[in-house]
Regions:
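Long, glycine/tryptophan/cysteine-rich extracytoplasmic
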Residues: 18-91, 137-171
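Alpha-helical transmembrane segments and their helix-start/interface "positive-inside/aromatic belt" motifs
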Residues: 1-19, 113-126
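Lipid-exposed faces of alpha-helical membrane segments in multi-pass integral membrane proteins
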Residues: 16-19, 23, 93, 97, ...
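Alpha-helical transmembrane segments of multi-pass integral membrane proteins
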Residues: 108-184
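Transmembrane alpha-helical segments in integral membrane proteins
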Residues: 9-16, 77-113, 167-184
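Hydrophobic, Leu/Ile/Phe/Ala-enriched alpha-helical segments that form helix-helix packing faces
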Residues: 6-10, 14, 23, 27, ...
Length: 184
C-alpha cells in the first residue's frame, strides 16, 4: 500500500523529469552542456547522462543539494549559479512539479486510509526518503574527461542530507495534501 505509493511517486517524478530533459535535448534545448559536460560525447552517452541528470534534478526538486559537473544546485542559492535564467526557471518548475506530485500523493493516502492520524503520511515520508537516499547511492557518476576542458565530471548528492531533506519535504507537502483533501 504505502510503500507502493512511495515508489510510484518517486518513479513518476523521475520519469517526467527524464522525458522533459530528453524532449529538451531533441529540440535543441540541451541543458546538459550547462554543467560543463562536453558536447562532443555521442548521442548514446548523452542519453545516459540525461538519465542520471534526471535523478539529480528530481533530488534537487525535493530540496536536496545536487552536485552536477561544476555546479552545486540548492534551491536557496540557485540564482547565484552560472546557469542560464531559462534553465533556472525550469528547475523551479521541477520543484513545483514535485510539490504537486507529493500533494496528490497526500490526497490519495487520505482517500485510501480515511483517518485523521498522521501515521500514513509519516510512513509514506519515511519510505519516500529511503527510496530517494537509495537513488542517491546508486546514481553516483564520474565521467572521465567529459568536460569541455577534459576534466573529470562528477554527479552526486549527499546520502544523509538526501534522506533528511526528502523526509522533511515529503512529509510537509504530503501532509498538506492529506489534510486538505478532508477540507469541506
Amino acid at each position: 500500500g504505502i510503500f507502493k505509493q512511495s515508489i510510484k511517486t518517486v518513479a513518476l517524478g523521475y520519469l517526467i523529469v527524464f522525458v522533459l530533459l530528453v524532449i529538451g535535448h531533441l529540440i535543441g534545448l540541451s541543458y546538459v552542456y550547462e554543467f560543463g559536460i562536453s558536447n562532443s560525447i555521442s548521442n548514446i552517452n548523452v542519453f545516459v547522462v540525461i538519465s542520471q541528470l534526471a535523478a539529480y534534478i528530481w533530488g534537487f526538486a525535493n530540496f536536496n543539494i545536487a552536485t552536477i559537473g561544476s555546479q552545486s544546485l540548492f534551491l536557496p542559492s540557485l540564482f547565484k549559479t552560472s546557469l542560464s535564467i531559462d534553465f533556472k526557471l525550469c528547475l523551479i518548475a521541477f520543484v513545483a512539479l514535485s510539490a504537486l506530485i507529493l500533494f496528490i500523493s497526500g490526497i490519495k493516502l487520505n482517500n485510501k486510509y480515511k483517518t485523521s492520524s498522521k501515521k500514513p503520511v509519516l510512513i509514506f515520508s519515511v519510505f519516500y526518503a529511503v527510496i530517494m537516499a537509495s537513488l542517491s547511492i546508486f546514481t553516483y557518476v564520474n565521467i572521465n574527461g567529459g568536460s569541455l576542458l577534459g576534466y573529470n565530471i562528477a554527479m552526486n548528492t549527499n546520502v544523509i542530507l538526501t534522506l533528511i531533506m526528502s523526509f522533511i519535504y515529503s512529509f510537509i507537502v504530503t501532509f498538506v495534501g492529506f489534510k486538505l483533501s478532508n477540507w469541506d
